[in-house]
């Protein structure tokens, strides 16, 4: 395929493969991010690079050194002087959302099998990204900080070869050696088996059945897929279709070469059915249960005699659900995995020239992020709302939002929040098994249209803070719209008082016995999360201060029930386990904030005291905290080799929310964070900050501004008050 011709490449990705002065970030009115390479000098002259372009590309942004801060508030002010220069004209902050190393292969394989190419500059920088994240042994992990796995190495090797990496390039040679040392691609986990089968370099007989017929079951059946966690069901819809039709790339020279390169034995001699449960030990996080293996035996028997009319009806049903998802999200879809699978479904069912296929082609770029290390595939189409929600709250709680210097920036943030609120339920609300969204805020953009309980919570708090505390701020979001957001939050509480992510819990937890993915934990049904629950508690508590007459009894009942859940979720050592950030520092900060808003602090609450003592016990000699992503895997505290600024801020803020009476731990944290601030007000990037499904780390690079500014500004006032009392 001419669009994927082999490329001449340097030995490493240390230097850019393209001219970074020619990259530009374009923003749609709704906040969609797309990177563009300008090939002519006239284009470059007509579209100058912005400060945020240069920053994300790792270029010199040309901002001046600031006066050295003499206290924490001045350090926070310097931090925001830097960060506001990266606020977009739309009012939000752009940023990467990378980290997982199985996303780019889906983009590349999904595009290749659909006959959709990339610009040469995009191909070059995607290869460079892979070069820059290869491990010392030549392989790739499940995320950028993880050890090499078959999943990461086989998929990224295929992606690099498709993009134009030659088989004899030193990076390819070393990657193959790593893969073969791990046993070759036969032991790739199920999602990898699926992608390699799509590429026609792994036989479909090596996959466990993916029965699309499950979608024909009555909705009331306990294992009906609409009850699964939304990311899982939205991936297995197109998976069921593509498995059902046995979609595969036509054989060509590259496919034939990969069949030789990926395996330690002859491709045509492999016993494919014997590979179905073969998962390399280095990849295995969630082994198959005996229940799942028994189910696979039954499904295998069914697959050998599946009724063609039933299979056709099931495939048709999966196609219908794919279209509903695409229409609900304008082909951005829930995330990049189901987005690329949906694209293949639409091309297979409708043809490459169909409107659906063309829209998918355009929407690929919403997930492609250009950074200092090359071009990556993001975990969603951004984290726009998530970032602005925290920054807006930080502006108010530090007092910076009241300063004339930052007022315009705060008002632009409010305008973005106004535009970003989801004003209606999804187009296909009931038929696509969606939860209500009218009044919610998304994680990224309202076009993508999915809300998470904590995103609506943080969005609501941000609006209330800005509209009530910024001088002269207009009431852009009406009381009715704020009440709509509250309605969404109240609709999401589960029976035990906790809040899950996207929806109510629809299936029993024993469904996790049927987790087929091997590399992820807690994916089969929704689970309650302390950090989601706390975001809702704090949002409702702040809302009722300003609007005390709306659903008063419902709000009180919800908060009381949620606090009961939070007490039960506290771990014996005193912290709360974080499922979306790393890890105990993250969740414990949110928990102590919410408890404080209902009157539970260090002086009044045993739970708060235990949490504070837990955090203080983990403070390091340098004054900071450092937690490894490994804590999320093993569900216990694991020290990072280095102190982390972001986690230090979470821990210090937790202590302040709890009204911890001793200043020394907070003073030491402030000193550590200030010591790492650069002269221009910024902080360098440190270790990865986020996580999902226990085993995959993901980046939140704007956290190093949002939480540092927030903590320093709060600490300045808090410490003054503590010392005044003494």
Curated annotation (Swiss-Prot):
PFTB repeat locations: 123-164, 482-524, 559-599, 608-657, 666-713
EC number(s) given by UniProt: 5.4.99.7
Membrane topology summary: Peripheral membrane protein
Any GO BP annotation: triterpenoid biosynthetic process
Keyword Lipid biosynthesis carried by entry: yes
EC category name: isomerase
UniProt keyword annotations, A-Z: Endoplasmic reticulum, Isomerase, Lipid biosynthesis, Lipid droplet, Lipid metabolism, Membrane, Repeat, Steroid biosynthesis, Steroid metabolism, Sterol biosynthesis, Sterol metabolism
Compartments it resides in: Lipid droplet; Endoplasmic reticulum membrane
Keyword check for Transport: no
Pathway stated in the Swiss-Prot or TrEMBL entry: Terpene metabolism; lanosterol biosynthesis; lanosterol from farnesyl diphosphate: step 3/3
Gene3D superfamilies in the record: 1.50.10.20, 6.20.120.20
Major subcellular location class: other
Induction conditions: Expression is up-regulated by methyl jasmonate (MeJA).
One GO CC term on file: lipid droplet
Listed PANTHER family: LANOSTEROL SYNTHASE, TERPENE CYCLASE/MUTASE FAMILY MEMBER
Function of the protein: Lanosterol synthase; part of the third module of ergosterol biosynthesis pathway that includes the late steps of the pathway. The third module or late pathway involves the ergosterol synthesis itself through consecutive reactions that mainly occur in the endoplasmic reticulum (ER) membrane. Firstly, the squalene synthase SQS catalyzes the condensation of 2 farnesyl pyrophosphate moieties to form squalene, which is the precursor of all steroids.
Protein name per Swiss-Prot or TrEMBL: Lanosterol synthase
Native species: Ganoderma lucidum
Phylogenetic placement of the source organism: Eukaryota, Fungi, Dikarya, Basidiomycota, Agaricomycotina
Gene this protein is translated from: LS
